[in-house]
Amino acid sequence: LLKDEALKPKQKAQVKLIEQKAENMSDLIAQLLFLSRADQGRQQIEKENVNLSELTEMIVGEQQFLAESKGNAGQIICHIEPEIWAEVDETLYIRMMINLLSNALRYGEGRDIEVSLSVHNDSDIIGKVKDHGIGISKGDIPHIWERFYRADKSRTGGSHCGLGLSMVKWIAEAHGGSVEVVSKEGEGSEF
């Protein structure tokens, strides 16, 4: 419809809005189905040996491109050790990183974001996503992993319904890892 020459600018804007809302609804349904399968122990994990360094850089590049196309001026700065390999479900890792990066971009207020990936003690892989944005209040931090919880109630709408961090937590734990947050209001958050 958007390519239809007969549509007036206002009609094209309305069609574009409808398409965006449909995409948001599709994302929400996919997240709910994922978490439902996880609750029932039916969410499959298909691990394979993956170069996390290259995969993380690819995800960062895609998210940077999307952010720039939406007018976000901040840069994603990478500190990624080369050749970090691990047995992971590539699709779930991508989903986890996109959730963390999209949150950092959304709440980072256009400031730079830092992504790091390193190995400690020869086997522990540590990944971090840090923004310098609005941060999370101390009172909200214990609840951010809960489904549908939104620390920033003033930012509503879109496809952001408070499921992303519960998915991040599930994915990390399903791979034998964990996720934590350090945050201070007005200074940003690090996951």
Regions found by a protein language model. Name each.
Residues 20-25:
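Short alpha-helical segment of the dimerization/phosphotransfer core of two-component systems
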